[in-house]
Structures are given as structure tokens and as C-alpha cells.
């Protein structure tokens, strides 16, 4: 099918040379091993300042202070430092948890809703990993249950690679309840949730994605797209830099976003075309129009009719359609589909028992599996023997998000678990032995069991039993 791509060979208007791509992000790193990075909001970085950034690297806070405001999480870390709490065991654990969770984040897919719990007596954070596309809008809502007098910090990071620290791209706290961000670079993102030190409780987090553009052909949606971004053109010599939306001649073409009409010139490939620059700086390209109904300089709102579907330009031998493209400074053409597609938004709610969130449970049947995400599809992470003990950290749909005693985390279907508040059997100590804080060889001894003592068993993990002594002490006993 013919292409109206303005960046095709011979069409110089679509080409540009830029010093910095917005995808580079010019991250300014934070005080601790480049953990927290941020993006300048400005689209233009003065050359002198850019040279300074390149010369100094991602090293200090002085440059960061020039370019951006601190996030709520960073301000809280500074307060901990000012009073010396970062040097305490608990304060250090809190900071380490904020770093560690970026590697331990569980994979989720929007729409996603989870009921979760953060233990106020421990230094914890939660992480959720999502794959997102340029042009999508990510909206995260957060609701505390019970006490709402403390802050919970929400931070969104872009994961670069296995050796680089993720880049902080957006932040909020529970006072605003919502984190809203338009994705400017496709990739893996990590949502971190962390409460103030010694605060916590149950919360509900909801993650959804939305289109950022109205569909540009009236009465149609993405099912009318019949040629997609990246399709081969001219025998493989170039790619299709847009999507083709088919509709009868004369169907209204509407503005996909609020913006200014910047050009209404004809060109050889697109025939009658319109260029629109939206409020995010994206340039929209509408081609093969039968007629234009706007003029250069006019400001339009999303949904305003700006033209009519046709087949002018190099589409004159094909059925009428709109070629729609998006171009961004420093990026060039980008796939419009994620910005146009409106995905489902119903997360389905939580069908498990909210009372067990934050509590210990155990496997109640022999076919239980630990999975990397809340779905029966894919290879299970591990087989879970009967009575395996775990702590429920959250719930979504009919799944519990759990952490095993060795720190492994994942999802277990709720119906394969039961409360661990009653013993499943009783064992008798064959000899005096240590009662341990965990089911590992390096765990601390917390008590001793005496030979001949009857010990109720509440769960298992590996070669250890979770037992209670006659004196009410709980711990792990090798068997």
C-alpha cells in the first residue's frame, strides 16, 4: 500500500538533527549510589548546562537542585539524614528496602488492582513491574485503609538495563492519591510504594492504562486499522511510519488532541495533509484527505472535525483511508497505536479473603504452584509441597501475592491456601535442639526445645517445621 510518510527518502521535511533525544532523559542521580534519578521537565536544555552535566556525570545533588524539585520520597530521606535516623538499623533497612524492591518488583499487567499490607514494625516497600508503550497514559490510584495520617510515597521508574540504576520519571504521595504519567519511552517500568518509617497498614492500589489520543476518524476505532507502523514499503526499502485507518470517502477526520494547526500544504506522498502540534509537543500528520476544513494557525480541540477521509497523493489507487502519524522531536516517527488504543480498564476486584492480607497461610492441597504473575498461563516458578508456609503480602483477583520464608515471592491461587493459625499435626522433639528464626542454616537461635516435648506444627518449608513450644515460643525446627 502506498505510504504518505513525510520522512520517506526524498522528503526532507520529516528529517531533523537533534543534540539530545528525550529518550536519553539526562538523568540527574541522587545521593545514594545513583539510586533515584529524575528528568528535567523542560524540553530544551541549554548547551552550557548540558556540557556541564556530561562533564560531571551522574554524581551530585547540586546540579539536580538546579534542574528539578525533590520528590516527596527524597525529602523524607533528607529528614531521616538530618536527625541521624539513616544511621540506625531500622533507618538503614528502610533505605535499603527502597533500593532492593527495584530488583524484586513483581510483574503485573494493567488493569491491575491489589489489596496489600505493609507491616509498620518492619522496613518494607512494594514494587510492581509493568511493560508500557510510548503514547500510553499510566494512571495509578492509591487508597489507605484505616489510619490515613501518614504519607505513602509512590515513585515510577524506567528500567534501563541489568547494570544501570532505573531512572525516576514520576512521583507522588498518598496525599494526592494519584500518579498520572504519559509514557514517552517504551520499556519496563517499576512502581514503588513505600510508607514512612514505622508506619503501614492495608491499602488498595489500582493501575490502569489509557489512550492519550482521541481516535482520528469519526465512528471508528483501532479495529479499522489495516496497515500498521513498521510495515514494509517499496519492496523493503523503507518502513511505514504511521497507521492507515480505512473508512468511506467523506468520513469526518477529527483532531486527535487539542493543539494548533501548523501546516496545510499539499505534498507528493500525502496529497492533502494537515499537521497539528498537540500540548505535549507531538506533531500529528493527517494524510490522503479528500478535503481540509481548517487553516494554518487555528487552535482546535480533541474531536473537532478538521478534514474528510480520501485517497489523495500516492493513495489514489487504493481505497479511501486516513494515514495518521506521530512525530516527536528527538525521536522521529513513533507508533501511534498505543496512543490510540483504549485497553480494558476493569481490573476485576479481589475475590480472596481481605482478613488474611499480612498474615501467615499455608498450602492446603498438593497441586499448589508458585507463579511469577497472577495467571495460570506460563511455567510455574516452583512446586509448593503440602503445608508450605508463606506470608500473604497482597491479593488480586483470586490470587494471593506471597513471600516464602526464604524471601522468594510470587503468586498462589487463593483456593490452594488456608490459615496457619491452627496446627496441622504434632511432633515430639527427639533431642534437645535450637529453635531458629528462619528455615535456613544461618538463622538465629531464638530458644531451645527439650527432648520429649510435644510441639504443635503450623507449617513446613524445606527440611524445617514451624512449631510452637509449650512456653508459647514460635520458630523453625530442623527435622
Regions found by a protein language model. Give the residues of each.
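C-terminal motif of bacterial Sec signal peptides marking the signal peptidase cleavage site
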Residues: 55-57
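Non-catalytic, beta-strand-enriched accessory regions in extracellular/secretory proteins
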Residues: 106-139, 240, 379-381, 386-391
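Surface-exposed, glycine-biased beta-strand/turn segments
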Residues: 184-272, 302, 311, 322, ...
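C-terminal edge strands of extracellular/lumenal beta-sandwich accessory domains
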Residues: 60-109, 128, 156-161, 181, ...
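Acidic, Ser/Thr/Pro-rich low-complexity intrinsically disordered segments
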Residues: 59-63, 70, 74-75, 118-175, ...
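Short histidine-centered loop motifs in beta-beta connectors
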Residues: 264, 280-303
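SH3/SH3-like beta-barrel superfamily modules
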Residues: 190, 382-413, 447-478
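Boundary regions of SH3-family modules and the immediately adjacent low-complexity/disordered segments
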Residues: 207, 340-342, 348, 353, ...
Amino acid at each position: 500500500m502506498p505510504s504518505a510518510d513525510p520522512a520517506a527518502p526524498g522528503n526532507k521535511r520529516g528529517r531533523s538533527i537533534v543534540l539530545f533525544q528525550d529518550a536519553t532523559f539526562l538523568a540527574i542521580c541522587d545521593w545514594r549510589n545513583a539510586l533515584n534519578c529524575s528528568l528535567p521537565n523542560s524540553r530544551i536544555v541549554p548547551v552550557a548546562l548540558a556540557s556541564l552535566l556530561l562533564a560531571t556525570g551522574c554524581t551530585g545533588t547540586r546540579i539536580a537542585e538546579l534542574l528539578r524539585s525533590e520528590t516527596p520520597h527524597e525529602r523524607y530521606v533528607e529528614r531521616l539524614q538530618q536527625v541521624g535516623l539513616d544511621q540506625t538499623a531500622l533507618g538503614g533497612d528502610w533505605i535499603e528496602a527502597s533500593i532492593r524492591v527495584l530488583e524484586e518488583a513483581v510483574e503485573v499487567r494493567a488493569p491491575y488492582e491489589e489489596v496489600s499490607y505493609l507491616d509498620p514494625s518492619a522496613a518494607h516497600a512494594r514494587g510492581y513491574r509493568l511493560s508500557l508503550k510510548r503514547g500510553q497514559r499510566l494512571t495509578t490510584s492509591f487508597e489507605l485503609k484505616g489510619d490515613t495520617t501518614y504519607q505513602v510515597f509512590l515513585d515510577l521508574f524506567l528500567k534501563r538495563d541489568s547494570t544501570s540504576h532505573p531512572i525516576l520519571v514520576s512521583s507522588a504521595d498518598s496525599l494526592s492519591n494519584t500518579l498520572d504519567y504519559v509514557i514517552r519511552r517504551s520499556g519496563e517500568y517499576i512502581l514503588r510504594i513505600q510508607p514512612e518509617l514505622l508506619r503501614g497498614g492495608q491499602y488498595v492500589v489500582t493501575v490502569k492504562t489509557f489512550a492519550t489520543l482521541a481516535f482520528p476518524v469519526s465512528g471508528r476505532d483501532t479495529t479499522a486499522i489495516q496497515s500498521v507502523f513498521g510495515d514494509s514499503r517499496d519492496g523493503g526499502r523503507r518502513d511505514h511510519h504511521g497507521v492507515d485507518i480505512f473508512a468511506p470517502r467523506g468520513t469526518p477526520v477529527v483532531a486527535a488532541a487539542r493543539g494548533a494547526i501548523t501546516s496545510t500544504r499539499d505534498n507528493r506522498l500525502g496529497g492533502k495533509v494537515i499537521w497539528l502540534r498537540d500540548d505535549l509537543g507531538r506533531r500529528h500528520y493527517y494524510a490522503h484527505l479528500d478535503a481540509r476544513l481548517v487553516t494554518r494557525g487555528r487552535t482546535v480541540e480533541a474531536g473537532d472535525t478538521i478534514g474528510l477521509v480520501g485517497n489523495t497523493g500516492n493513495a489514489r489507487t487504493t481505497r479511501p483511508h486516513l494515514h495518521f502519524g506521530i512525530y516527536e522531536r528527538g525521536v522521529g516517527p513513533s507508533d501511534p497505536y498505543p496512543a490510540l488504543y483504549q485497553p480494558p480498564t476493569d481490573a476485576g476486584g479481589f475475590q480472596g479473603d481481605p482478613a488474611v492480607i499480612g498474615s501467615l497461610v499455608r498450602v492446603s492441597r498438593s497441586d499448589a504452584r508458585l507463579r511469577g504473575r497472577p495467571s495460570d498461563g506460563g511455567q510455574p516458578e516452583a512446586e509448593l509441597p503440602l503445608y508450605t508456609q508463606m506470608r500473604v503480602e497482597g491479593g488480586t483477583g483470586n490470587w494471593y501475592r506471597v513471600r516464602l520464608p526464604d524471601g522468594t515471592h510470587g503468586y498462589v491461587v487463593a483456593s490452594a491456601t488456608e490459615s496457619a493459625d491452627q496446627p496441622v499435626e504434632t511432633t515430639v522433639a527427639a533431642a534437645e535442639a535450637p529453635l531458629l528464626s528462619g528455615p535456613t542454616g544461618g538463622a538465629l537461635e531464638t530458644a531451645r526445645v527439650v527432648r520429649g516435648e510435644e510441639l504443635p506444627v503450623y507449617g513446613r518449608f524445606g527440611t524445617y517445621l514451624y512449631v510452637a513450644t509449650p512456653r508459647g515460643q514460635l520458630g523453625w525446627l530442623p527435622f
